[in-house]
Amino acid sequence: MFVAGNGNGRVEVFDLNNDGTLAQPTATYILGKPSEHARRTHADAWSESQTEFPGALAVEHSNQRLFLVDNTTGQSLPGRGSQIMVFDIHPDRIATGADVLFILGQPDANTKTSGLAANHVGRRLGVAVDEANQRLFVSDGSNNRVLVFNIAPDRIATGMAASTVLGQEDFTSREPGLSIRRMSRPGSLAFSPKDERLFVSDNGNNRVLVFDAAPDRLRTFSAATDVMGQPDFETASPRTDMRGFA
């Protein structure tokens, strides 16, 4: 089990029993810091083995990798951004203080600037993995979009470009919107492998968008197939009943 701790600026890894209960109350490994006693001490302290402000994470079991969003202190400051760190979590190779395998969303592990490109993200990120098709979905909240990366072992690379973008017509646009194709400040993501649907929390519009994410049908600027929390794709009113969100 992987637990991202913002206060300590690290990820704690716990062993579980076969029934899902904790094997022991203490973490077995620490990712993002060199030892079990290390914690976040000051801003701008990150590297290939150091996390600063870990957030959303997703585990990919087939290749045993952890995709972790690492934010920077002072996210509201101009120019600050986030990155996605990819760790090897194979039982034979995982280790406290291990270096990352790859960095996505930034050119390297030492960069956390807010950007707008196929290979450069902003901040307020969410992640979800499609294991069968080896894809990583990344919600880029400050750029009002969702990026799709090919994470196959023979394709993934530090600083790589996304293959598809949702919510925008291209990789250099970031306008928020309210429609069947646009979104505003997307956050949490969930992927359903059974029917290949992607659920996007469209925070700025008080709704959840549902996309047909089958590889042969998902395209840049695809239209959502369904909306939850609103009666249609043109409404964004906050609601407090059983059918709405706020």
Language-model features and meaning:
Residues 25-49, 96-119, 160-180, 222-245:
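Surface-exposed loop and turn segments in beta-propeller and other repeat-based domains
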Residues 1-3, 65-68, 135-138, 197-199:
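Conserved beta-propeller blade signature
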